[in-house]
A protein has these predicted regions:
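Catalytic nucleophile-loop/oxyanion-hole region of alpha/beta-hydrolase
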Residues: 54-57, 85-111, 115-119
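Conserved alpha/beta-hydrolase
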Residues: 69-88
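Short beta-strand/loop motif that positions the catalytic acidic residue
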Residues: 235, 241-243
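Conserved alpha/beta-hydrolase "acid-adjacent" motif
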Residues: 248-254
Length: 309
């Protein structure tokens, strides 16, 4: 079972990241809510961060944002996926999967408006990573991202990487027949059927009642890669896949083998020692900064190497 207790305690212990002050402002575009962390309006890089399944950007991701935004040339945008958090849309569903992918274009365009000269990077955690893989390989996007970070990515049942857990220990429980009917109908039937249940502990829901506990077929299809091996192989932008060594959902070794087997010259693998599926959010910032440093000029290589793993 995912260790929510550890995550909540860690989030409390961090408080406001002391590595440097970044201004935070809230924004909204086409019903999408986002929070922007930055030092100046002239940032050279902006990282757009997408949360994991059922939660929203307020679920500890501000710690990651402040860690990253301690780099003065870098801004961070935390987004609530449509149907989550403060974004509009019926909770846990969407009229069609493509709407979620189009929303990434909307946010990237908004970041281009705010930072005309900045490079734009996408970071997805868990199901947010699966969604970004779909966006980059299944949607004819109008915007261009400069790099991608997949943090403890949930690549779905077609990746073959899930741990063999008892039903009571699984975070997500799935009814298969609505997905089958939806696929056979070309997406016309049962798109709004609530086919996925997310098993948040009662204490977590008491503290965060806005978490989404059920996903429709359409929402699940938006977040879940259909052919993850082929989709990973199709990536053509600098990509870092970060695995959590103590991930409760899948083993880091299986993720590494998946990258070695299906990745390409653009895809690198990194391991976050001691991290769980959730706590990796607090441990990823140095790897992310190094990834951007290697792909593009940001800060000082020597300075970042001093912080790195």
């Amino acid at each position: 079972m995912i260790d929510f207790d550890r995550y909540v305690e860690q989030a409390k212990s961090y408080g406001e990241w002391p590595g440097g002050h970044a201004d935070m402002l809230s924004g909204r575009v086409e019903g999408l809510s986002y929070r922007l962390y930055r030092h100046t309006a002239e940032s050279e890089h902006v990282i757009v961060v997408y949360h994991g399944g059922g939660v929203n950007s307020a679920a500890g991701y501000d710690v990651l944002a402040r860690q990253l935004a301690a780099e003065p040339t870098l801004a961070v945008c935390l987004v609530d996926i449509r149907g989550h958090g403060d974004s509009t849309g019926e909770r846990g569903t969407v009229e069609r999967p493509e709407r979620i992918w189009r929303d990434v274009d909307v946010i990237l365009a908004e970041m281009r408006r705010r930072f005309p000269l900045a490079r734009r990077h996408l970071l997805g955690h868990s199901s947010g990573a699966g969604m970004l893989l779909n966006y980059l390989t299944r949607y004819p996007g109008e915007q261009q991202a400069d790099s991608l970070i997949l943090l403890a990515p949930e690549l779905g049942p077609f990746s073959g990487m899930a741990r063999d857990l008892a039903a009571t220990a699984r975070f997500a429980q799935v009814r298969q027949w609505p997905f089958v009917a939806n696929a056979l109908s070309g997406g016309r039937w049962f798109g709004h059927a609530r086919a996925v249940s997310l098993n948040f502990p009662p204490a977590v829901l008491a503290a965060a009642p806005d978490f989404v506990c059920q996903y429709s077929v359409n929402m699940a299809n938006a977040l879940t890669p259909r052919a993850p091996a082929k989709q990973l192989a199709a990536l053509r932008l600098p990509t870092l896949l970060l695995a959590a060594a103590q991930d409760e959902l899948f083993s880091a070794q299986s993720l590494q083998r998946f990258v070695e087997r299906h990745g390409n010259v653009h895809v690198a693998f990194g391991l976050l020692e001691g991290s769980t599926h959730l706590s990796c959010v607090f441990d990823a910032h140095r790897f992310v900064l190094q990834h951007i440093t290697r792909a593009f000029a940001i800060g000082s290589d020597e300075g970042l190497a001093g912080e790195g793993a």
